[in-house]
Amino acid sequence: MPDYSYRPTIGRTYVYDNKYYKNLGSVIKNAKRKKHLLEHQEEEKSLDGLDHYIVAEDPFLGPGKNQKLTLFKEIRNVKPDTMKLIVNWSGKEFLRETWTRFVEDSFPIVNDQEVMDVFLVINLRPTRPNRCYKFLAQHALRWDCDYVPHEVIRIVEPSYVGMNNEYRISLAKKGGGCPIMNIHSEYTNSFESFVNRVIWENFYKPIVYIGTDSGEEEEILIEVSLVFKVKEFAPDAPLFTGPAY
């Protein structure tokens, strides 16, 4: 005779087919992934029109003529765990001789000339042989005119100087470009207004600190220069006429 009494120890066994059951987290993640993919595709479609244009990954190596002007070369001693101020571009007098040389001697004087960018380039070299360390740099572009920077600061989140021990800073403000029209008259009429309206209205004044990751005091040869990225316009007509042109 069968026993129909209730026994809680006897349970029931269910077999689930994984084909119809999925992890809830995987379902949600997959849905979000599909949503992000669709949004990304829509965003890419809106940028398809830019495929007809070419830009340089490094603006310094992009189109245009680089006009270099060396400001100074000198040797500085830098103690460990500190950075020394090497560029303090706070005054107009610093530019007087610089721009006189730039405009009169080496700048190609033509109308409709456009300076697309100005780079402050700092080249660093150890003066002692067989030294193994890396150069550090830190700079600021925006600060109050009354601010007086310290000559020496502690190393806090610096940047390592990259290839060829060269540190480049773009001084162009957002939007860039500095179209200089009638540069002769603008420069001749008033040097102060030329500096204020043409230079500082379009470019930042930087301050730069340099250091090393060495545990000893190091002697560094510093070369500071300005590189002007000048836009080159194509001529309206060829310079020569004939079968070859």
Curated annotation (Swiss-Prot):
Query: Keywords for this entry?
Result: Viral occlusion body
**Any stretches that span the bilayer, and where are they?**
none
- An annotated Gene Ontology molecular function: structural molecule activity
Transcription regulation keyword on record: no
- In the UniProt record, which is one GO cellular component term? viral occlusion body
Pfam families referenced in this protein's UniProt entry, alphabetically: Polyhedrin
Task: Keyword check for Zinc-finger, yes or no.
Answer: no
Query: What does the record give as the function of this protein?
Result: Major component of the virus occlusion bodies, which are large proteinaceous structures (polyhedra), that protect the virus from the outside environment for extended periods until they are ingested by insect larvae.
Similarity comment: Belongs to the polyhedrin family.
Protein known as: Polyhedrin
